[in-house]
From Swiss-Prot:
PANTHER family recorded: TRNA (GUANINE-N(7)-)-METHYLTRANSFERASE NON-CATALYTIC SUBUNIT WDR4, WD40 REPEAT PROTEIN 4
Lineage of the species this protein comes from: Eukaryota, Fungi, Dikarya, Ascomycota, Saccharomycotina
Region named Disordered: 55-92
GO BP terms: tRNA (guanine-N7)-methylation; tRNA methylation; tRNA modification
Organism per entry: Saccharomyces cerevisiae (strain ATCC 204508 / S288c)
Record-stated family: Belongs to the WD repeat TRM82 family.
Name of the molecule in the record: tRNA (guanine-N(7)-)-methyltransferase non-catalytic subunit TRM82
Assembly and binders: Forms a heterodimer with the catalytic subunit TRM8.
Primary gene name: TRM82
GO molecular function, one term: enzyme activator activity
Signal peptide: none
Chief location bin: nucleus
Amino acid sequence: MSVIHPLQNLLTSRDGSLVFAIIKNCILSFKYQSPNHWEFAGKWSDDFDKIQESRNTTAKEQQGQSSENENENKKLKSNKGDSIKRTAAKVPSPGLGAPPIYSYIRNLRLTSDESRLIACADSDKSLLVFDVDKTSKNVLKLRKRFCFSKRPNAISIAEDDTTVIIADKFGDVYSIDINSIPEEKFTQEPILGHVSMLTDVHLIKDSDGHQFIITSDRDEHIKISHYPQCFIVDKWLFGHKHFVSSICCGKDYLLLSAGGDDKIFAWDWKTGKNLSTFDYNSLIKPYLNDQHLAPPRFQNENNDIIEFAVSKIIKSKNLPFVAFFVEATKCIIILEMSEKQKGDLALKQIITFPYNVISLSAHNDEFQVTLDNKESSGVQKNFAKFIEYNLNENSFVVNNEKSNEFDSAIIQSVQGDSNLVTKKEEIYPLYNVSSLRKHGEHYS
């Protein structure tokens, strides 16, 4: 049975008139017009072919060695005195049993003037720079593609809208001027680094205008470095026992972090003080399922060891609320930040959904989630939910009309697209955060 591939992320423009959605290797654009009317505004697909690129690289290497091989062949003779010619190497290509190739699009960000969209592509480990033109039939136009030696994992855009900070899979951080011309071969040196995979990065500044880069990694670390003098480490924030998957920044130097621990950490990143921790263990237990059982090789005899992790934590822009979700669960947890005691967190609300949450984002004071709706019966729905704060009720509520109309817009936009309408077994892996957890084998 074929289904529309679930949405992997959403990003909304400042005024809410433009929404970008990631599905597999595509970015879909929609214009939002009140009341609850959506208009398809174009699609961009990453057509980069990994297999062909591998073949091209191999062909270049073979061509470069051809003259050398010819000289060596002259020296090789059989017993009869005939020259022996070497057989050219076969160009590699995936065969039976080879792991599938997933061309994820990640890390959607808009520049502050919203004239450009920045994203990352797994296909060639690149940073993508798009022009955004709301008057065009297709609002996105790819302008530049900066390729890296390792996969970009997280990005942050500087206030000048031209500098992008990139944190990669191998622990290095780079600074790229998106107005520059991309190099054919990546030669840039990192501006700072960790010894393990980076998971998040933020470029911020203090009240004196001094800039800092905050990075988190798989090794429980949060590092604060001066920018652009990144060789100067300002401080480390220690307290996590497991990996840090997500961080977000608020006013007055507030930093929130989460990951493989069963706690949310609140910090004053300027002083390095851990202000508080919020233990969500008992809150999330009713929402855990078989997907949270530890891998068999790390289980006990009763097969009841569970492992869970926060996939994303994000703050409301104007309201004192922060939301997060645990990977492979059907809820988001909203916390209220104390206005009297900086860093104090208290449960505000738990919102449940019919399917597991895949991503969480925020637009002003609205939270947005995408759902793993591949098991939706009948007409596929529940691709995303838009969650608004109701001042009269002092609570967050799902805007069902807006969400339902968005479902219809998604369905119409992908009709006849054999890439985005796919078999269930061909859906990209949607739960990757739990793989960051380290077990005994990582310490041996």
